[in-house]
UniProtKB/Swiss-Prot annotation:
The active site is at residues 64, 112. InterPro entries: Idi_bact, IsopentenylPP_isomerase_typ1, NUDIX_hydrolase-like_dom_sf, NUDIX_hydrolase_dom. Its main location: cytoplasm. The keyword Transcription regulation does not apply. Coiled coil: none annotated. This is Isopentenyl-diphosphate Delta-isomerase. Residues 27-160 form the Nudix hydrolase domain. Catalyzes the 1,3-allylic rearrangement of the homoallylic substrate isopentenyl (IPP) to its highly electrophilic allylic isomer, dimethylallyl diphosphate (DMAPP). Keywords: Cytoplasm, Isomerase, Isoprene biosynthesis, Magnesium, Manganese, Metal-binding. It comes from Nocardia farcinica (strain IFM 10152).
Amino acid sequence: MPVELVDEAGRAVGACPVAEAHRDPGKLHRAFSVLLFDTAGRVLLQQRAAVKTRFPLLWANTCCGHPAPGESVEAAAATRLAEELGVAAGLTEVGVFRYRAADTATGRVEHEWDHVLIGTLDTTPHPDPAEVANLRWVRPAEVRAKLAAEPAAYTPWLAEVLEIADAAYRESAGR
């Protein structure tokens, strides 16, 4: 599957295979990270499956992925939610950030222009075991504490996704 390469301002500049984009030193490309909330304000974290080529078995946001070149992040994120968790949720883009992280265990690199989307979920997810090892609903404050205490158990992008998503959720919920 190709990913959309972007420049320093997030503008599309081309495409390449996903494996090539994640080969060291990494090519800057468009990605998305979804964080779903329940009605109590908890966030749904997933433990990435052992077969993932980047950061396997680490805890991450609800789901993430890459839109195809020219595809909207909202459409791609909705597709991934259905594929990975068997759920649908209304999604809102609430921010974007750039990061680069090398996975020393796999030799792969994430260099992403990451769009953050949030939504609420009031149904039970049905994770695909090829994508997701485990799921957990956690209060944002607890996630922050665990990120500080055990950073190696979490993906390098989770802290930034959580900050952007939680601020937007609290603002929209009047909390």
